[in-house]
Every structure is written in structure tokens, then in C-alpha cells.
């Protein structure tokens, strides 16, 4: 397709002439068939909802076609309308646009749907089994058309993938406001998502999938590397300094979980990652994110033990069921240093977890045709997995929940995962590592994308970020030196670690001072022409302020407010009027639908004074909202961090907690 044809296709939106039906591409990793949950009348409603995107003249052709999709896949994806052009992040100037900010958003959307990036690209799923950008291809086409014609005096409103329309606003308003899965709380159970999504009225946006901010598995590699590094450091005996030769066992090679073997390599350990889907395993192998593929445990385990003995850094994938791996390790009493799990247990009944004893295809059939039996199989499998993990932890393994609802769903399955007091046997990685060491001090997954799609601009940005962090380190307080050192090492090695999949993007854990100074330096470099085109700033929702999630991001909040969502909601509101180019707020993400409220932003910076003002105003709020909340929860690191920020920032005045002696409380009752 020529550039002119691409521009015409984008600008057209839904075409006047029906495109030809497209054959089902078996080389692509497709979403499993979803649960058949709609009543006959609801199926008619789903069809009526889908057809409202199209003129009446197409209805007699599309109605039976969409009804068949609903029957075969449990959803109406509108495959016929999938574009014929290749889907990937193009340089910003290749998109038809009246607003440069809108062109940047188009680039970010296409990156989320790139087949090298997305888990189920033809079903518009970026990661996590159900993390959707849109519900169907008509929505994609309409959104791209709106973005191509909007101005900086308009805002596009997005309801769970559906473009409500362009509304008049002003230059400093967001260009796009996104909500995903915003349902009445009493109707926020997993089956409610199944029903609403099948009807075409709501979607699960995960975090960066539905907010157009995914940057491929690099986005989670850094956080996973930090987690593995610090988990491994917990295992060091007195006098030891090297973690080489430690064995890390986990599961999942999907859009997010695929980061684990790469993170293991960067950390310097031996890793084994189980993945039941051979297409997913092969994809990570082809991308160089896992070193070896094994289908036999009899071959894999001796190879891993040899690597441990040699203190060799290597990542191995077991193409098979995770429970088989865990049970064999327990049976053979293999010493495992670190254990975790990153199957998509936020979505356990619809492809997020495949039970032991069933093949991949058997599972796909059963979850669609016998959902109750499939649920029983999943829960039995979790009980077996936990039993094996418990045996290994009794022998000294450090196991942590990686925020995928493993502990939560295992407890619901009746697994031996609870202590006598009702708390989980094992910590969330946020409780033990990410919360007290990073979030409480404002460190989180800051990221940027070069809209030129030029690797030279990314290299320049890496050098700028390194110089900024090294300068900050000179006067940093001792409690954040370790965090700075790990991140300086990360950014210096980023190019050599070949982290880019999709757009020219980088992730870097930084605090408020770091994010702001790096962004201002980027803006100045764009102004001077050292970076050729605008940069998109953003972050994962999994951050200091962006997510209220009692089993993950806010699991180290102990004042009882971990089930409250004021922080995430306030955050997106505050970002929207302080300079964000787009904002989003989602139900679900990470741990699952009904368990989380999370939000994010994107900000296009272009070297202007206006961009500088937005950077200073918005990033300060985006980080310190969460630090202030964590400080009020009496988290020591946050109390120190917010005091330092108030000293630095005129106009910032945060309510601080008064600490009470235990004796005062105990003698009051």
C-alpha cells in the first residue's frame, strides 16, 4: 500500500463500499473463543448494537456475518473491516492530521496493535488475554478518522473503545479522554464483563492497552528486572555480593509475562519460564527474549542445573504446563531460589490460565462449551500448583506474587495459601519490594516514545536521561541512592540489551525530580533540534499514584484505605487540567475486573514554552498525589519524600499524619 493509499484509508473511516471478507489467519495468535453468556434476546441486542456503526444498506450482508462471529468467537470483532495495511508505529508525519498531538496518538494506537507487539492483534487485544484497545475494527476505523481531522480546539471522547465523538474544547484540554469498563460497582463481577463485552457496550482495557501507552514487553522488563534483582538480593547470605547462579522459576510468555526471561538475563540469573502456548513461546524466542525452548522436563531440568552450577546467565522456556514443571521440581527436591507466576489470573476462566491435564486446544474448547467444568479444572490446577510451591518454599525458595491475582484466585480455589490469621502465606512484590523501595519515594515506570521512530533520537534521549540522573545523584539523599544507581545502570545498558519491540521507546524508573528534569531536558533538546521530532511522555498505570489495587499497587497501604479508589480517580482528573494530551481511567488492570481502578496519561512535548509549562505542572501532581496518599497512610519513605518535595516546591502544602504510640492505642480499649 502506498503512502497516499494509507492516508486515504485512515481519512475514510468506515468505507462506503464493503471491503471483501478476510480469511482467518492461522499464523496469528488469536484470542480464545469467549464464554457463551448471552441469552437469545441479548444476542439480538449485541447484533443490533454492532450494526449501528454501518448504514442500513449493509445490514442484510453484515447481520448474518456478525451473528456467526458471535457464535464462533463469543464476540463481534468485525474482521472484514480489519485494515489491509501493515499495522505498526509510523513516523508522526506519515499520518494525515490537523493536530500534531492527534497524529502522535495515532502512532501510539498502531503500536498497540502491531503483531510484533500485541498478543491477539486481530482481536484488538494487546496483552493479558483481554486487554483491549478497541472492541471491534469499526471503532478503530472511526477513531483514526476522528484523529486525522480533529484540531487542537477539540477533544475526542472514548467510552470503552467506542468513539462518542469530537467535542469543542481548547488547546490546553486533553485531545482524548478515555474511560474503560466504568460500570456501576455492583455490576463489576467477571461475568458482568463477559456480558457487557459480548454486547459491545464495555471493555477491559487492562492498563496501557486501552490507554494507548503500551511499548512492548520492554515496558515490564524494567520493573521485572528491579523485582528479580531485589528479590535475589534478599537471598544473599552475609558476605555474598553476587546473585549469579540463582535459579528463578515462573510462568507466562505473553505480552507482559514475556518480559520475565529477558529480565532474568539482565539481572544475571538462570530462569525457567513455563508457557503452554507454543506460538507465544516461539514469538519470544524469535525476538531474542528467551534463549532456549524445551519441550521435555527430562532435558530442561538437567540443563538448568548445569547452568546454575556454572553460574551462567541463561533463560529457558518450558513449552508445557506450569503445574507439571512445579510438581517435577518439588518431586525431585530441586533447589529453587526465586519463584513467581505471571499467568493472566485476572482472567482465569477465559484464557488467562490453562489447567494441568488439558491440552491448549482442549482448554479452549472447554472454556467456551463447558465453562463451569473448566472453572473446576482451573481451581483444581491452582490447588496442585500451590501445593508444589509450598513444598519448595519449605526448602528455602522465596516466592512472591507478581500482581496477577495468583494469591487471590488460589485462595478462592481453596488452595493452601493462607496463614492461620487469614493473610496470604506469600507477599505481593509490591509489599516486599516495589512499594517500600520505589513507590513510597515516587519512583515508578516513567516512559517516553520518539515520534520520529528514529533510533538515533532514542539514543540521544538515553544519553540525556543518563546525564540528568547522574547529576541528581550528586546531591541525592542516602535513602534513594540505590534506586538511582540501578536506574543509571539500566539506562546505560538499555541500547546493548536490545529492548525495543515496536516503537522507539524507553522505560525508566524515576521519581518526580527525575521525571521532570528529564522531560525538561528532552523539551530543550527538541527545541534545539538535537531530537528531531516531538516526544510522547507517559507511564504505566502501575505507578505511585495511578492505581488503587489492594492486591498489588496499594497492597502496602495499611491504614484500611487500600480498598478506596480516590487516589486513581483524583489523579486522572488532576492530570487532565494540568497539561496531559490524553488521559484514561479504567476498571481492572493487572489483578482483574472489579478488583482495581487505574489510570494513565500521555503528553506530547514539542520544544515549546507551553510544553515546558505542562511538564512542570502535570508531572509534579502525577507523582506527588500518590506520595501524599502513601504518606497519610503512615508509610515512612513517603513521609520523608513528601517533606522534601514541600521544601522544593512553592505552593505545595500536604496534610501530614501525626504518629500515635502503640501504648496509647492499646490502653484505650
PLM-predicted stretches and their roles:
Residues 1-198, 202-213, 217, 371-521, ...:
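Long, compositionally biased, glycine/small-hydrophobic-enriched stretches that function as flexible linkers
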Residues 148-151, 167-172, 181, 186-187, ...:
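Solvent-exposed alpha-helices and their adjacent loops that cap or buttress functional pockets
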Residues 192, 239, 285-289:
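Hydrophobic N-terminal alpha-helices or hydrophobic patches in metabolic proteins across all domains
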Residues 205-229, 233, 244-247, 253-313, ...:
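Catalytic or ion-translocation cores adjacent to nucleophile or general acid/base/metal-coordination motifs
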Residues 270, 335, 398:
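Residue-level detector of anion-binding/catalytic polar loops
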Residues 278, 320-323, 342-347, 403-409, ...:
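Glycine-rich beta-alpha junction loops
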Residues 315-343, 350:
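Active-site/ligand-binding-proximal alpha/beta "capping" segment
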Residues 535, 539-570:
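Small-residue-enriched alpha-helical segments and adjacent helix-cap loops
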Amino acid at each position: 500500500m502506498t503512502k497516499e493509499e494509507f492516508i486515504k484509508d485512515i481519512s475514510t473511516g468506515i468505507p462506503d463500499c464493503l471491503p471483501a471478507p478476510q480469511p482467518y489467519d492461522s499464523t496469528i495468535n488469536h484470542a480464545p473463543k469467549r464464554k457463551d453468556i448471552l441469552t437469545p434476546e441479548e444476542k439480538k441486542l449485541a447484533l443490533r448494537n454492532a450494526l449501528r456503526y454501518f448504514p442500513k444498506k449493509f445490514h442484510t450482508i453484515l447481520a448474518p456475518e456478525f451473528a456467526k462471529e458471535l457464535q464462533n468467537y463469543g464476540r463481534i470483532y468485525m474482521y472484514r473491516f480489519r485494515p489491509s495495511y501493515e499495522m505498526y508505529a509510523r513516523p508522526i508525519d506519515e499520518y494525515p492530521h490537523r493536530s500534531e498531538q492527534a497524529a502522535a496518538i495515532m502512532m501510539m494506537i498502531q503500536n498497540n496493535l502491531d503483531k510484533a507487539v500485541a498478543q491477539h492483534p486481530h482481536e484488538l487485544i494487546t496483552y493479558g488475554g483481554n486487554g483491549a484497545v478497541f472492541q471491534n475494527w469499526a471503532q478503530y476505523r472511526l477513531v483514526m478518522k476522528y484523529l486525522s481531522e480533529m484540531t487542537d480546539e477539540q477533544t475526542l471522547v472514548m467510552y470503552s473503545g467506542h468513539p462518542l465523538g469530537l467535542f469543542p474544547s481548547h488547546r490546553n484540554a486533553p485531545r482524548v479522554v478515555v474511560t474503560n469498563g466504568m460500570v456501576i460497582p455492583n455490576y463489576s463481577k467477571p461475568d458482568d464483563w463477559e456480558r457487557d463485552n459480548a454486547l459491545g457496550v464495555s471493555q477491559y482495557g487492562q492498563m496501557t492497552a486501552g490507554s494507548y501507552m503500551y511499548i512492548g514487553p520492554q515496558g515490564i522488563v524494567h520493573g521485572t528486572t528491579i523485582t528479580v534483582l531485589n528479590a535475589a538480593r534478599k537471598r544473599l547470605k552475609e558476605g555474598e555480593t553476587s546473585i549469579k547462579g540463582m535459579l528463578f522459576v515462573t510462568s507466562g510468555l505473553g505480552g507482559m509475562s514475556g518480559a520475565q526471561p529477558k529480565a532474568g538475563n539482565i539481572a544475571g540469573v538462570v530462569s525457567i519460564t513455563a508457557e503452554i502456548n507454543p506460538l507465544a513461546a516461539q514469538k519470544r524466542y524469535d525476538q531474542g527474549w528467551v534463549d532456549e525452548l524445551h519441550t521435555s522436563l527430562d532435558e530442561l531440568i538437567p540443563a538448568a542445573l548445569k547452568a546454575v552450577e556454572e553460574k551462567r546467565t541463561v533463560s529457558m522456556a518450558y513449552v508445557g504446563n506450569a503445574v507439571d514443571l512445579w510438581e517435577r521440581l518439588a518431586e525431585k527436591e530441586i533447589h529453587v531460589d526465586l519463584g513467581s507466576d505471571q499467568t493472566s489470573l485476572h482472567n482465569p476462566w477465559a484464557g488467562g490460565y490453562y489447567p494441568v491435564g488439558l491440552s491448549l486446544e482442549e482448554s479452549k474448547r472447554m472454556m467456551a462449551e463447558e465453562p463451569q467444568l473448566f472453572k473446576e479444572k482451573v481451581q483444581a490446577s491452582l490447588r496442585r500448583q500451590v501445593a508444589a510451591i509450598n513444598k519448595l518454599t519449605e526448602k528455602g525458595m522465596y516466592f512472591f506474587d507478581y500482581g496477577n491475582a495468583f494469591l487471590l484466585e488460589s485462595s478462592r480455589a481453596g488452595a493452601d495459601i493462607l496463614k492461620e490469621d487469614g493473610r496470604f502465606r506469600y507477599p505481593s512484590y509490591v509489599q516486599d519490594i516495589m512499594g517500600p523501595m520505589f513507590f513510597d519515594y515516587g519512583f515508578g515506570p516513567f516512559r517516553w516514545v520518539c515520534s520520529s521512530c528514529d533510533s538515533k533520537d532514542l539514543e540521544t534521549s538515553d544519553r540525556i536521561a543518563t546525564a540528568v540522573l547522574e547529576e541528581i545523584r550528586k546531591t541525592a539523599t542516602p535513602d534513594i541512592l540505590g534506586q538511582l544507581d540501578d536506574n543509571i545502570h539500566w539506562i546505560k545498558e538499555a541500547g546493548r540489551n536490545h529492548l525495543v519491540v515496536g516503537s522507539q521507546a524507553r522505560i525508566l524508573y524515576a521519581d518526580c525530580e527525575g521525571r521532570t528534569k528529564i522531560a525538561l531536558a528532552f523539551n530543550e533538546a527538541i527545541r534545539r533540534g538535537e531530537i528531531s521530532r516531538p516526544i510522547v511522555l507517559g507511564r504505566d498505570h502501575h505507578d505511585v499514584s495511578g492505581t488503587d489495587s489492594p492486591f498489588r499497587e496499594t497492597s502496602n497501604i495499611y491504614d484500611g484505605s487500600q480498598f478506596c479508589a480516590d487516589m486513581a480517580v483524583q489523579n486522572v482528573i488532576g492530570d487532565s487540567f494540568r497539561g496531559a494530551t490524553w488521559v484514561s481511567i479504567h476498571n481492572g488492570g493487572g489483578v482483574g475486573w472489579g478488583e482495581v481502578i487505574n489510570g494513565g496519561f500521555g503528553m506530547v512535548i514539542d520544544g515549546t514554552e507551553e510544553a515546558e509549562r505542562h511538564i512542570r505542572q502535570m508531572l509534579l501532581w502525577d507523582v506527588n498525589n500518590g506520595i501524599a496518599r502513601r504518606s497519610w497512610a503512615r508509610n515512612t519513605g513517603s513521609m520523608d519524600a513528601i517533606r522534601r518535595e514541600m521544601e522544593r516546591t512553592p505552593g505545595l502544602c500536604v496534610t501530614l499524619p501525626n504518629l500515635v504510640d502503640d501504648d496509647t492505642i492499646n490502653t484505650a480499649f
